[in-house]
From Swiss-Prot:
Protein name: Putative oxygen-evolving enhancer protein 2-2
Record-linked InterPro entries: Mog1/PsbP_a/b/a-sand, PsbP_C
Any single biological process term in GO: photosynthesis
Record-stated family: Belongs to the PsbP family.
Record gene name: PSBP2
Any Gene Ontology CC annotation: chloroplast stroma
Organism: Arabidopsis thaliana (Mouse-ear cress)
Pfam family, one: PsbP
Length: 125
């Protein structure tokens, strides 16, 4: 995904966690609105949750990159959740984002290495 930005560097968004809060649309929006029973670790009236598992920064070719590993879950228990790896940088007035994901079951059956390779191989010339 490529979007215009007035930022000069990815670090202008703040920490990786602050960056994610500004682009949280990447994780999807909760479609259901209404009262729900709070169970399974979900907040009251919430049917989806996202947890940041890991963040890091790295400089490649003079550009700072953010790497984020996020586990999202929905109340329906869809595959136990999704592992979403997000790589982002800023160059030439544009925000570049690569998101790779796999369902929890597939993640632990071997998809992890492919998703990680896709996310870590992303770079902007």
């Amino acid at each position: 995904m490529i979007t215009p930005t007035d930022k000069k560097s990815i670090t202008d968004y703040g920490s990786p966690e602050q960056f994610l809060s500004q682009v949280n649309y990447l994780l999807g929006k909760q479609a259901y609105v209404g009262e729900t029973a709070s169970e399974g670790g979900f907040d009251a009236n919430a049917v989806a949750t996202a947890n940041i598992l890991e963040t890091s920064t790295q400089e490649i070719g003079g550009k700072e990159y953010y790497y984020l590993s996020v586990l999202t879950r929905t109340a329906d228990g869809d595959e136990g959740g999704k592992h979403q790896l997000i790589t982002a940088t800023v160059n030439g007035g544009k925000l570049y984002i690569c998101k790779a994901q796999a369902g929890d079951k597939r993640w632990f059956k071997g998809a992890r290495k492919f998703v990680e390779n896709a996310a870590t191989s992303f770079s902007v010339a």
